Amino acid sequence: MNRRGRSRGLEAINRNTNFRNADLRLYEFGNVYHFDGSKTHEHPVKNYSESEHIGIWITGKKETENWKVKEEPTTFFTLKANAENIFSRLGIKTESCTIESISNDIFSEGLEYRFNNVLIGQIGYVNNKILKNGNISADVFYGDLCWTAILKVIKNHKATYTPLRKYPEVRRDLALLIDKDVQFSTIKALAFKAERQILRSVNIFDVYDGANLPEGKKSYAVSFILQDEEKTLNDKQIEKTMSRLISVYEREAGAQIR
């Protein structure tokens, strides 16, 4: 999304917040124009290209106040789930994407998604400088999905359907102490390298790089969903799988299990 498109989203957040409507989930379709100064054309307008993007803004609380649900703020992972659900509904599996950490003028911290080496989206925390300029004090999470690029990569996609799995999923978590330059994409790839048959998904649900950690280290809290299509998993199978995951992380990522 271009600067004007981002500004409109932040203006809407500022306006709503001033009227005590602070729990927001907004989206907008818009055109983005790119100038390529490396090319020389007889007609200067040909140096410009146009693509369609979706902007997503999330801020405030996850749920409206009620007696059944504990009041919690939205987080980066709220946005991540929304973006990945869009990809999934369009047939783009996140395990087939290259996912890298990013930090730039827009995002103080975030993730970039590429599918077949094509950039399809960026999500993250809106930079504090941008929020300050927009008179916004709350955390804002922003996603820029490249709709034109997404349509191109899925144009040959054929929908397939499989029966719902009969047997229950099992979740296991690991806390990994790793070097700061180790990316989540590496953690995910190593997991599927170690276990292809029953590992369904890998997700990061907490990152910590503050006090009480060795210099140059960070802590990832990672969840793993395991499921067998033919039978219910037993403790022995689960423990064997988790042991393989731990071994590959220690051996190939230099991780310590916390």
Where are these regions (language model features)?
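A carboxyl-terminal module marker
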Residues: 27-30, 39, 49-50, 55, ...
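Small/polar/charged residue-enriched interaction surfaces, especially the RNA/DNA-contacting tracks
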Residues: 42-46
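Solvent-exposed alpha-helices and their adjacent loops that cap or buttress functional pockets
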Residues: 19-20, 47-49
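Polar, glycine-rich mid-to-C-terminal structural blocks
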Residues: 1-35
